């Protein structure tokens, strides 16, 4: 009998008793009335703000405080007006009179909302040799740095802007006497604003904004109240999921796998943070839980013969043909089968569209690529970097997650758009590739020790003979290139489309989870702190 391997995974620190104990007073109607009043006041503030720079600062603050979804129409009208004026004014006015901060902020906000603004707006800040000129304006340089991350492939001016601003900010960081500016710079250098999770950014920015002498107290109060009210909804979502998880018996029956319900919920929350989309978060969390189990028996617990049969059963999708599977695989298959049918039933009932064949294909394809990687591992095969990535961007489960997100949030589902998405265009491929590469950077060392297929780092080292450090730099460059492709294909085409935003969020949650290592499989203090901040600890209103 073939000995089974173990991942030696740590137990979950989030038990059901603790999760069920979570409560919040912010479900009361009085808070909803208070929030509605504050939202009306903010709309007045937006309407009465007339100066262009004041408008840009206001929009930026609203976004970073995590309340912009309440003011989409108002923000869009302001930015449309700014963009139209920018197009008809002379070049000097377009450049905001050569003010680096204003030009950079305007560029970032307009691009973020899908407006096609040329990188040439930064030419007046460069010398004859094409280099950015040193300026004594750290606030402006920080704004330039943040703007540079909305670049697309081939935009060399923005590439120079990033190099210049990064170098300058690092050099000046220890000399800064303003503690707020220093903290902003330090955080930006860790991960730029464009690739941060909105909800976590809001927690941090609320604290920063509150310490400013010019803070607008109406914005601040709404941001705090909004965060606490949404947190109350997150608590209810997670409590429901914990009951579901316990009732399935999966934690006991699949005790070889990682028990990561709370972390799966954090993935779903990063994907879809909007309070009213709780059902979508529940679906994504369920899917993530099932993926983790399946991943762990393909990678570690299952024998090659077992996973070959399981892969075949996923292709057949027949619950009457499971006798050849061991018990743990029968349970996993039925959990996938029942969950898929439940999702398909809800959409058929609500929209009259049958997506069960779409879901079957997703799970069958995932099984195929998992099995390909398992054969690589068991045979000792080292794929080339290209061969690895052609399989691994799918095996990281990005397509499964993105399509379940699409089905969960799009109502009505556009069948032509769905057919287009099933060809795996950039809106599917690029976020999935970022997830794959970020995962490899964070987990490769531990997974190789446990016994897993070589990752992109090892494949590149084997292919080129380079060091691990050089391979990691290569993977980081691949991530950067892929993020630029995302900016072009997703942000510049569908910035206000809910699914476009969700696809961008997959890249963001990937960078977040693997920024300090394996923040999912081996949850570290940073993951725990973020979960506490988002789900457990409210923000003080006073």
From Swiss-Prot:
Question: Domain notes, please?
Answer: The Asp-Asp-Xaa-Xaa-Asp/Glu (DDXXD/E) motif is important for the catalytic activity, presumably through binding to Mg(2+).
Residues that, per the record, bind Mg(2+) 3: 439, 443, 447
Biological source species: Phyla dulcis (Aztec sweet herb)
Gene Ontology BP, a term? (-)-exo-alpha-bergamotene biosynthetic process
Q: Which family does it belong to?
A: Belongs to the terpene synthase family.
Which cofactor names does the annotation list? Answer: Mg(2+)
Q: Provide the function of this protein.
A: Sesquiterpene synthase converting farnesyl diphosphate to trans-alpha-bergamotene as the major product.
Sorted alphabetically, which keywords does the UniProt record give? Lyase, Magnesium, Metal-binding
A Pfam family it matches:
Terpene_synth
**Protein name according to UniProt:** Trans-alpha-bergamotene synthase
Top-level taxon of origin: Eukaryota
Q: Which reaction does it catalyse?
A: (2E,6E)-farnesyl diphosphate = (1S,5S,6R)-alpha-bergamotene + diphosphate
């Amino acid at each position: 009998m073939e000995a089974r391997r173990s991942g030696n995974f740590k137990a979950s620190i989030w038990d059901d008793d603790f999760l069920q104990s979570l409560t919040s007073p912010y479900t009361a109607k009085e808070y909803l009335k208070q929030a509605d009043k504050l939202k009306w006041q903010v709309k007045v503030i937006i309407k009465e703000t007339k100066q262009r720079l004041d408008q840009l600062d206001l929009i930026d603050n609203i976004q970073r405080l995590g309340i912009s979804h309440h003011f989409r129409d108002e923000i869009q009208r302001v930015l449309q007006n700014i963009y139209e004026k920018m197009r008809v004014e002379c070049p000097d006015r377009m450049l905001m009179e050569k003010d680096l901060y204003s030009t950079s902020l305007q560029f970032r906000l307009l691009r973020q909302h899908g407006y096609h603004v040329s990188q040439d707006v930064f030419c007046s800040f460069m010398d004859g040799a094409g280099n950015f000129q040193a300026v004594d304006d750290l606030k402006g340089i920080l704004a330039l740095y943040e703007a540079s991350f909305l670049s697309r492939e081939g935009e060399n001016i923005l590439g120079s802007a990033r190099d210049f601003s990064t170098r300058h900010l690092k050099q000046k960081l220890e000399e800064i006497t303003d503690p707020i500016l220093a903290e902003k710079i330090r955080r930006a250098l860790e991960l730029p604003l464009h690739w941060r999770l909105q909800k976590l950014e809001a927690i941090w920015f609320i604290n920063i904004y509150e310490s400013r002498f010019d803070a607008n107290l109406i914005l601040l109060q709404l941001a705090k109240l909004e965060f606490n009210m949404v947190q109350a909804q997150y608590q209810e979502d997670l409590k429901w999921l914990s009951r579901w998880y316990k009732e399935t018996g999966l934690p006991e029956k699949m005790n070889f796998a990682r028990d990561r319900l709370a972390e799966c919920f954090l993935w779903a929350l990063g994907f879809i943070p909007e309070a009213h989309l709780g059902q979508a978060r529940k679906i994504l969390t369920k899917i993530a839980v099932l993926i983790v189990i399946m991943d762990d028996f393909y990678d570690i617990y299952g024998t090659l013969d077992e996973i070959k049969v399981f892969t075949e059963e996923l292709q057949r999708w027949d619950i009457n043909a499971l006798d050849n599977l061991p018990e743990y695989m029968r349970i996993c298959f039925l959990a996938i089968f029942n969950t898929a049918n439940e999702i398909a039933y809800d959409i058929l009932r609500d929209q009259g569209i049958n997506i069960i064949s779409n879901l079957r294909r997703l799970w069958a394809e995932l099984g195929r690529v998992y099995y390909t990687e398992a054969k690589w591992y068991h045979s000792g095969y080292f794929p080339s970097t290209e061969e690895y990535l052609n399989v691994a961007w799918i095996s990281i489960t990005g397509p499964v997650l993105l399509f379940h997100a699409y089905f969960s949030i799009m109502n009505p589902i556009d069948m032509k758009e769905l057919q287009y998405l099933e060809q795996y265009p950039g809106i599917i491929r690029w976020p999935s590739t970022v997830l794959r590469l970020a995962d490899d950077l964070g987990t490769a060392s531990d997974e190789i020790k446990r016994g897993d297929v070589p990752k992109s780092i090892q494949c590149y080292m084997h292919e080129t003979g380079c060091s691990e450090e050089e391979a990691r730099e290569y993977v980081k460059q691949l991530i950067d290139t892929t993020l630029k492709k995302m900016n072009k294909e997703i942000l510049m085409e569908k910035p206000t489309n809910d699914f476009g935003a969700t696809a961008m969020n997959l890249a963001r949650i990937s960078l977040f989870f693997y920024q300090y290592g394996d923040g999912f499989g081996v949850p570290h203090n940073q993951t725990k702190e973020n979960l506490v901040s988002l789900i457990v600890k409210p923000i003080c209103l006073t």
